[in-house]
Swiss-Prot record:
Organism: Danio rerio
GO biological process: blood vessel development; cellular response to heat; leukocyte migration; muscle organ development; negative regulation of proteasomal ubiquitin-dependent protein catabolic process; positive regulation of transforming growth factor beta receptor signaling pathway; protein folding; protein stabilization
Quaternary structure note: Monomer. Homodimer. Interacts with unc45b.
Induction comment: By heat shock during early embryogenesis.
HAMAP family, alphabetized: HSP90
Single Gene Ontology MF annotation: receptor ligand inhibitor activity
Pfam families to which the protein is assigned, alphabetical: HATPase_c_3 (PF13589), HSP90 (PF00183)
Compositional bias segments (type: Acidic residues): 224-244
SMART domains linked to this entry: HATPase_c
Subcellular location, record wording: Cytoplasm; Dynein axonemal particle
Function, as annotated: Molecular chaperone that promotes the maturation, structural maintenance and proper regulation of specific target proteins involved for instance in cell cycle control and signal transduction. Undergoes a functional cycle linked to its ATPase activity. This cycle probably induces conformational changes in the client proteins, thereby causing their activation. Interacts dynamically with various co-chaperones that modulate its substrate recognition, ATPase cycle and chaperone function.
Gene: hsp90ab1
Keyword Cytoplasm: yes
Protein name: Heat shock protein HSP 90-beta
Lineage, broadest ranks: Eukaryota, Metazoa, Chordata, Craniata, Vertebrata
Length: 725
């Protein structure tokens, strides 16, 4: 009793972090049909703990002094209605217990709850890093006993009522590792049945790299031979304890001495004995070491699910080996969808497990695969790396560089094979197109191969997407460049002033509508010998015949004075004003210099919270105003300017045209209110409202004086109107 009281006093109670408590409530109070995934999650956690201790032991073998066998045991107990999982992994310190199991929410907790409420499958839980809590699908109470080499043995316990307790454990020492005891709910006793446990482990965890042993209590008839003296003694003692009944029965029934001896012998030979049956549940040879021809797609699917905790099958798989000076085997999978945190910088990626001669080394080896391929899942098993390799040695390893090069090559082969199946490639591209574009930005060696995998909508592709190869095959004879436009959406770019003439002349324009496209085309200068040209930048040259060239020269001469006047009025707001060859129905547009940012890129950069303002200064687009010589607005403005170049109305109209062109070209206004006031002035003029009628409309208490609204004419306000950029 005193011992029990002492233990009770030592127990500390902690509240679950709010999001975790919410998640547990959701798990407990919602009906899920596939509760069996709890076992997969707990086995997976045990495997991770074993990986960690094995990795540590490579550099410090004394870490295994507390237990050399690396294994997972599963023990069902029918009488107590418990299912226990024991691993000899790294274990947890007291701080680990408190943080990992309750007080610090993983980044995926909230995301997983949102996914669940949106109808996602509970089996996704492992992908969000909160798999442990799936134990509450079947358990009313969970006890975790754990021992880390650097700390005492602790017990964690919770019935999921919003809190948990942690105390020093004075029970049976476990050496090192973690013991998870699930006190099953009354309606979940199927998980202490031998058949059910075997079925679930085979389904979800047969490719775990450590032996999973099931311990089941069974009964058997035990035969006792005469020469087993000790057992004979035990038998005699049992007979003595049973009292005098047996001799009496024998005396009554023993007419024939032979008979009695025989019966006695039989009793000695067979007794019912309880014993613990051990069975290893995952004897399967590592799948990557087998011949790909002998492996079915179902086996690949099962391995993929056990490797990744994904609830869906993979989209594609590449299984290969490299032999020669360097030997390694690899098995690479493309998932069906991108994980929720694909581009989260701080998160350690653990997508490719590195093995050396079938011994697991690590699962977050950044040197194994470039960042843009961080969605690839799989295993790499090297014959050449040393078993005790450290992370620092890996960074310098030439062997690893060769492995990495081969993995990238095989991934690109896999993507190219997938591209032949249009439906599956669409699924892949929807999920991972950003990664391919990031690859073009980062991987100069493979840029050409990656560019062949790109798909874009275009002015001629309708709702379908086209590859650059298909675009080139449709190019006109006199077309030397691939034309593209970047923007926020297909509708925006399709109706842009920039594509008017290009499309009217029958040239195809690619629509690039993702922010990453801007970075991608900065590096992708050409494709198949054809340069990529943005229709929003200066110097757009469309193939022209002699008549068109002649007309262009005439227009330039005709509008030369207007261009000069507009440049004077707009001053530093534009680099230059020129006659355009790209406009059809718009009066003017703003184009950017060849090496500056496009309007879309400027928008993206302004949205960066941590942007470098010094870069903004010199990279922000130098704006060029291009005017349409065939548009009646420009022709009338030219005539008005010829008549009187000092006309205030001309000045106001030029500024209004410039600001409107900024908006239609995708730029933002520095002072939208002043532009709005100008538009309202124009509306007033259009409706025939007198300027003076503006005064009585103002409220007496209004802080804004009538002069604050810039008029279209007037010396004092003209300068203010010029300030709008």
């Amino acid at each position: 009793m005193p011992e029990e009281m002492r233990q009770e006093e030592e127990a500390e109670t902690f509240a679950f972090q709010a999001e975790i408590a919410q998640l547990m409530s959701l798990i407990i109070n919602t009906f899920y049909s596939n509760k069996e995934i709890f076992l997969r999650e707990l086995v997976s956690n045990a495997s991770d703990a074993l990986d960690k201790i094995r990795y540590e032991s490579l550099t410090d073998p004394t870490k295994l002094d507390s237990g050399k066998d690396l294994k997972i045991d599963i023990i069902p107990n029918v009488q107590e209605r418990t299912l226990t999982l024991i691993d000899t992994g790294i274990g947890m310190t007291k701080a680990d217990l408190i943080n990992n199991l309750g007080t610090i929410a993983k980044s995926g907790t909230k995301a997983f709850m949102e996914a669940l409420q949106a109808g996602a499958d509970i089996s996704m839980i492992g992908q969000f890093g909160v798999g442990f809590y799936s134990a509450y699908l079947v358990a009313e109470k969970v006890t975790v006993i754990t021992k880390h080499n650097d700390d005492e043995q602790y017990a964690w316990e919770s019935s999921a009522g919003g809190s948990f307790t942690v105390k020093v454990d004075h029970g049976e020492p476990i050496g090192r590792g973690t013991k998870v005891i699930l006190h099953l709910k009354e309606d979940q006793t199927e998980y202490i049945e031998e058949k059910r446990v075997k079925e679930v482990v085979k389904k979800h965890s047969q490719f775990i790299g450590y032996p999973i042993t099931l311990y089941v209590e069974k009964e058997r008839d035990k035969e006792i031979s005469d020469d087993e003296a000790e057992e004979e003694k035990a038998e005699k003692e049992e007979k003595e304890e049973e009292g005098e009944d047996k001799p009496k029965i024998e005396d009554v029934g023993s007419d024939d001495e032979e008979d009695t001896k025989d019966k006695d012998k039989k009793k000695k030979k067979k007794i019912k004995e309880k014993y613990i049956d051990q069975e290893e549940l995952n004897k399967t040879k590592p799948i990557w070491t087998r011949n790909p021809d002998d492996i079915s797609n179902e086996e690949y699917g099962e391995f993929y699910k056990s490797l990744t905790n994904d609830w869906e099958d993979h989209l594609a798989v590449k299984h290969f080996s490299v032999e020669g000076q360097l030997e390694f085997r690899a098995l690479l999978f493309i998932p069906r969808r991108a994980p929720f945190d694909l581009f989260e910088n701080k998160k350690k990626k653990n997508n490719i497990k590195l093995y050396v001669r079938r011994v697991f080394i690590m699962d977050n080896c950044e040197e194994l695969i470039p960042e843009y391929l961080n969605f690839i899942r799989g295993v790499v098993d090297s014959e050449d790396l040393p078993l005790n390799i450290s992370r620092e040695m890996l960074q310098q390893s030439k062997i690893l560089k060769v492995i990495r090069k081969n993995i990238v090559k095989k991934c690109l082969e896999l993507f190219a094979e997938l591209a032949e199946d249009k439906d599956n490639y669409k699924k892949f591209y929807d999920a991972f197109s950003k990664n391919l574009k990031l690859g073009i930005h980062e991987d100069s060696q493979n840029r050409k191969k990656l560019s062949e995998l790109l798909r874009y909508q275009s002015s001629q592709s309708g709702d379908e997407m086209t590859s650059l190869t298909e675009y080139v095959s449709r190019m006109k004879e006199n077309q030397k460049s691939i034309y593209y436009i970047t923007g926020e959406s297909k509708d925006q770019v399709a109706h842009s002033a920039f594509v008017e003439r290009v499309c009217k002349r029958g040239f195809e324009v690619l629509y690039m509508t993702e922010p990453i496209d801007e970075y991608c085309v900065q590096q992708l200068k050409d494709f198949d010998g054809k340069s990529l040209v943005s229709v929003t930048k200066e110097g757009l040259e469309l193939p022209e015949d002699e008549d068109e060239k002649k007309k262009m020269e005439e227009d330039k001469a005709k509008f030369e004075n207007l261009c000069k006047l507009m440049k004077e009025i707009l001053d530093k707001k534009v680099e230059k004003v020129t006659v355009s060859n790209r406009l059809v129905s718009s009066p003017c547009c703003i184009v950017t210099s060849t090496y500056g940012w496009t309007a879309n890129m400027e928008r993206i950069m302004k949205a960066q919270a941590l942007r470098d303002n010094s870069t903004m200064g010199y990279m922000m687009a130098k704006k060029h105003l291009e005017i349409n010589p065939d548009h009646p607005i420009m022709e009338t403005l030219r005539q008005k300017a010829e008549a009187d170049k000092n006309d205030k109305a001309v000045k106001d109209l030029v500024i209004l045209l410039f600001e409107t062109a900024l908006l239609s070209s995708g730029f933002s206004l520095d002072d939208p209110q002043t532009h709005s006031n100008r538009i309202y002035r124009m509306i007033k003029l259009g409706l025939g409202i007198d300027e003076d009628e503006d005064v009585p409309v103002e409220e007496p208490s209004s802080a804004a004086a009538p002069e604050d609204i810039p008029p279209l004419e007037g010396d004092d306000d003209a300068s203010r109107m010029e300030e709008v950029d």
